Amino acid sequence: MKTLIVDDEPLARNELHYLLNEISGFNVIDEAENIEETLEKLLSETYDLVFLDINLMDESGIDLAQKIKKMKQPPHIIFATAHDTFAVKAFELDAIDYILKPFELERIEQAVNKVKHQISNSNEIDHITSEPSTLSMQQDDRQENEDQTVLPIEMNERIYVIRKDDITAVSVNNGITTINTTHRTYQTNEPLNYYEKKLSNNTFIKIHRATIINKTHIDSVEHWFNYTYQVTMTSGDKFQVSRSFMKAFKHEIGLA
């Protein structure tokens, strides 16, 4: 289960992280300390569960939960806070549970089990309602994405249809996804992983957890800080290749 802990207090994050490591079933536990970092992670990664504090430095956890709820595939939310005054509002937002600080392992485990139960039930329903040829359907979906030459983008209550070949890069910053093309720029609230699926062919490569580029639109590559690269696109936009994506990037453009 992939989980994100959102709390502006490092000690609280560390304590909850430690307790979750005592419970089986967590393969990834990430952390965020503010709204901007949280939205960036949620738009670039898919999480099963978010532990969310109420009082964050820059915004209310309740307000953040309302934004999360509007996502196409929102993660489950467990509020983890020192205040009990927002419990009713939390459950109005379909929170799985509401746990109070100081944290106790037994209480955390009880809340986590509720999430596991919901995920299990959801998977069973998906299995029952799916066709027998699920694998072939997934293959067909991938093939459809590769065959589809255009991509619809919704912005300002209008839907723009753009050619995939014209897309130079897709990136996330401050919770906003930007699609750069050869002739203009679009902004949307769709998460980065949505475009990863839509642009799943050999032309588009991920160079950062928040950036996808079209390698056919690379103009130049230069050495950058900490043994990384900076990529300049034909549009003039510049993007940094993060160290974790360096090996794959070099292979994709023939430097390996």
Curated annotation (Swiss-Prot):
Residue ranges annotated for the Response regulatory domain, each copy included: 2-116
SMART domains linked to this entry: LytTR, REC
Region described as Disordered: 124-146
Gene3D superfamilies with a match to the protein in the record: 3.40.50.2300, LytTr DNA-binding domain
Name under which the protein is recorded: Sensory transduction protein LytR
InterPro entries: CheY-like_superfamily, LytR-like, LytTR_DNA-bd_dom, Sig_transdc_resp-reg_receiver
Span of domain HTH LytTR-type: 151-255
MF annotations from Gene Ontology: DNA binding; phosphorelay response regulator activity
Keyword Ribonucleoprotein among UniProt keywords: no
Location, primary (coarse class): cytoplasm
Record gene name: lytR
Subcellular location, record wording: Cytoplasm
Protein's job: Member of the two-component regulatory system LytR/LytS that probably regulates genes involved in cell wall metabolism.
Keywords: Cytoplasm, DNA-binding, Phosphoprotein, Transcription, Transcription regulation, Two-component regulatory system
Modified residues (4-aspartylphosphate): D53
Post-translational modification: Phosphorylated by LytS.
GO cellular component: cytoplasm
NCBIfam families xref list: PRK14084.1 (NF010684)
